[in-house]
Amino acid sequence: MPLLDSFKVDHTKMPAPAVRLAKVMKTPKGDDISVFDLRFCIPNKDIMSEKGTHTLEHLFAGFMRDHLNSNSVEIIDISPMGCRTGFYMSLIGTPDEKSIAKAWEAAMKDVLSVSDQSKIPELNIYQCGTCAMHSLDEAKQIAQKVLNLGISIINNKELKLENA
């Protein structure tokens, strides 16, 4: 079985918080789709809390769209990684990592400004599969940590695994 792209990078060298361009591909019609690794935690050293990650999932995509979508960029999806060290973001277009980092920072500030758990989008039994598994406080702790540490840019060449 061929390795997925995410398993071709050395996770022991991965900084966080950091942005990494994971993949660019073309659609049959020629549009570029970019996939970004938005790494919140250093792999195998730290993870995001379950409830905080779930709440971020509800907030992060909307806030990132507010700051990143344009005539040349449209976010398709932002989904948490199973390892709970970050999110993958797929989008149409090819923005640079610096613009992603700037939007991510602004989105984290937006998370901190959410006043109450009742303001979390789609937090109900009809639109969320585990609506009891949320914590705005934990999401805010994750956001504050990102802002405190600052977001760096990952160079894929520095992370490439040999023989992968």
From Swiss-Prot:
UniProt KW keywords: Autoinducer synthesis, Iron, Lyase, Metal-binding, Quorum sensing
The reply on keyword Kinase is: no
Task: Name the EC number(s).
Answer: 4.4.1.21
Gene Ontology molecular function terms on file: iron ion binding; S-ribosylhomocysteine lyase activity
Catalytic activity as recorded in UniProt: S-(5-deoxy-D-ribos-5-yl)-L-homocysteine = (S)-4,5-dihydroxypentane-2,3-dione + L-homocysteine
Q: Does the keyword Phosphoprotein apply?
A: no
Q: Which residues bind Fe cation?
A: 54, 58, 128
For this chain's record, the cofactor binding note is: Binds 1 Fe cation per subunit.
Necessary cofactors: Fe cation
Give any single GO term for biological process. quorum sensing
A Pfam family this chain is assigned to: LuxS
**Do you know which InterPro entries this protein is assigned to?**
LuxS_sf, Metalloenz_LuxS/M16, S-ribosylhomocysteinase
Family named by the database record: Belongs to the LuxS family.
Q: What is the stated purpose of this protein?
A: Involved in the synthesis of autoinducer 2 (AI-2) which is secreted by bacteria and is used to communicate both the cell density and the metabolic potential of the environment. The regulation of gene expression in response to changes in cell density is called quorum sensing. Catalyzes the transformation of S-ribosylhomocysteine (RHC) to homocysteine (HC) and 4,5-dihydroxy-2,3-pentadione (DPD).
Q: Which NCBIfam families match?
A: PRK02260.1-2 (NF002602)
**Subunit comment for this entry?**
Homodimer.
**Name of the protein:** S-ribosylhomocysteine lyase
Species of the source: Campylobacter jejuni subsp. jejuni serotype O:2 (strain ATCC 700819 / NCTC 11168)
